[in-house]
């Protein structure tokens, strides 16, 4: 999973909220993780919450503008999906990826919901994943090539996502769930939250 926050007026800056370059410090919680920190004039609180009874989890980002000018931010989530046995993915993830079917669905409140199904049987099952914004998805992608372009092959670190996401289904060799959340406008001293929710179904 990768979460990228884009914002800070006039800068075009981007930060990864997960991984070694994250501005957050993480600690474990009873049902997930909690990350706290600052990025520029933004105070950030990122939580990962696991559902206690279902195969579901949610990322929630709370932001507060500590500056004296308005700020607009955009949160982008990317999830590398396999929906297959661990051994099969480690053996050839490109092969596994070709059997994933992506279906963008439309929800009147939350915008695009991405449904992903593994068409190659895993035992007797075909795992499915649903991914949605907690607010409203305004754009999506289904392959890493759409998100990072060919630049990702030329560097050890992933480049910033290419926005806006194309909102077009591409079923290539690097299946990815990518959702671009509706921009969040923060007045001076104001706060707001964004995030994404996932549910795994084993049918």
Task: Describe the predicted segments one by one.
Residues 7-54, 154-180:
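Extended, loop-rich substrate-binding clefts of extracytoplasmic carbohydrate-active enzymes
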Residues 6-7, 78, 199-201:
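Predominantly extracellular/luminal cell-surface or secreted proteins
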Residues 80-82, 178, 185:
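Residue-level preference for alpha-helix termini and adjacent loops
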Residues 35, 50-53, 57-160, 192:
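Polysaccharide-binding surfaces and accessory modules of carbohydrate-active proteins
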Residues 7-12, 21, 104, 118, ...:
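Generic low-complexity, intrinsically disordered sequence content enriched
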Residues 71, 184-201:
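Short Pro-Gly-centered flexible turn/kink motifs
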Residues 1-3:
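Beta-strand-rich N-terminal accessory domains
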Residues 25, 43-47, 62-64, 72, ...:
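Ser/Thr- (and often Asn-) enriched beta-sheet segments in non-cytosolic proteins
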């Amino acid at each position: 999973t990768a979460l990228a926050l884009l914002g800070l007026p006039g800068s075009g800056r981007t930060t990864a909220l997960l991984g070694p370059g994250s501005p957050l410090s993480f600690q474990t919680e009873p049902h997930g993780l909690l990350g706290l920190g600052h990025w520029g004039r933004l105070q950030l609180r990122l939580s990962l919450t696991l559902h206690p009874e279902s195969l579901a989890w949610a990322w929630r980002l709370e932001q507060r503008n500590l500056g004296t000018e308005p700020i607009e931010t955009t949160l982008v989530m990317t999830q590398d999906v396999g929906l297959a046995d661990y051994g099969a993915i480690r053996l050839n993830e490109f092969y596994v990826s070709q059997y994933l079917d992506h279906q963008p669905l439309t929800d009147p409140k939350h915008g695009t919901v991405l449904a992903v199904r593994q068409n190659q049987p895993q035992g007797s099952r075909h795992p499915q994943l649903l991914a949605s914004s907690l607010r409203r998805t305004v754009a999506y992608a289904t392959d890493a090539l759409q998100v990072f372009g060919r630049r990702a092959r030329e560097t050890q670190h992933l480049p910033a996502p290419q926005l806006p996401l194309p909102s077009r289904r591409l079923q290539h060799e690097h299946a990815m769930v990518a959702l671009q959340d509706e921009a969040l406008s923060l007045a001076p001293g104001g706060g707001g939250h964004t995030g994404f929710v996932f549910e795994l179904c084993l049918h």
